[in-house]
Amino acid sequence: MVYKTLFALCILTAGWRVQSLPTSAPLSVSLPTNIVPPTTIWTSSPQNTDADTASPSNGTHNNSVLPVTASAPTSLLPKNISIESREEEITSPGSNWEGTNTDPSPSGFSSTSGGVHLTTTLEEHSSGTPEAGVAATLSQSAAEPPTLISPQAPASSPSSLSTSPPEVFSASVTTNHSSTVTSTQPTGAPTAPESPTEESSSDHTPTSHATAEPVPQEKTPPTTVSGKVMCELIDMETTTTFPRVIMQEVEHALSSGSIAAITVTVIAVVLLVFGVAAYLKIRHSSYGRLLDDHDYGSWGNYNNPLYDDS
């Protein structure tokens, strides 16, 4: 029985430690390739399996440090981040367009060490509704100017999880295949500015915005206080509140009438005791032993020195 108890305690302790430790594994971004016409979902190229570094597009906002990694699997995981775009109309079956952004914005992605080419392809299914599958190919070319990836990268920190609605983080993705972790800037509205110079055959310029899906993650337990500190706090609270509680209980238990009745009863008992004692003493001192001693068979009491028969 003792061994079973120790084993159960070890299991509970290990589980508590695992839950208390923050998850340090980076989030893997895997996105579907087929979408509905009003939405476009971006997937990273299978050739790029290394972790991309996220560098802030606006240098004044360096508040938090979050890892952003892109992986090649196309299957959806519980920790997926899907990027939806606004309603767009694409007329050509296959069109290639590049967007360059010269105005740095905190909600856009601008590569710092290389250009990012964005190719767009269209796929049609048997149902007749065209669905756009967009494959983002990352290539290093230092000679080209920085290219804009219009969708934002919603990143969520695994260690800091709040109960408030998830914020959308905008970060800049570089293509130098390094694992340097930089900060991201939270933006309140998930909107991205349109690229000033965009060449596309569609009537409307596709403006994409990123929405972060709630990622099911384990919540870190609240800060635990040691048992000794808890015991000391409880002892302090009990010692300070104990006399007050007793006084309140006494006040509630004994009303003014009860206190008066108890006082009168005690006084009456004391008076009765003293009265009986005084009565017995007076009686004994008055008669002495005249009524008790009849040694000589007469009314005289010769043993009493106060009584003189002569």
UniProtKB/Swiss-Prot annotation:
PTM characteristics: Highly N-glycosylated and O-glycosylated.
Signal peptide positions (record): 1-20
Membrane topology (Cytoplasmic): 280-310
Keywords: Cell membrane, Endosome, Glycoprotein, Golgi apparatus, Membrane, Phosphoprotein, Signal, Transmembrane, Transmembrane helix
Start-end of Polar residues biased regions: 40-74, 93-103
Transmembrane parts of this sequence: 259-279
Tissue expression as described in the entry: Widely expressed with highest levels in heart, kidney and placenta.
UniProt-annotated glycosylation sites, renumbered to this chain: 58, 62, 80, 176
Biased composition range(s): Low complexity: 104-115, 150-209
Intervals, Extracellular compartment: 21-258
Expression induction or repression: By androgens.
Record has Glycoprotein as a keyword: yes
Phosphoserine: residues carrying this PTM: 298
Location of this chain's protein in the cell: Cell membrane; Golgi apparatus membrane; Endosome membrane
UniProt record similarity statement: Belongs to the PARM family.
Task of the protein: May regulate TLP1 expression and telomerase activity, thus enabling certain prostatic cells to resist apoptosis.
Name of the protein in its database record: Prostate androgen-regulated mucin-like protein 1
Organism whose genome encodes this protein: Homo sapiens
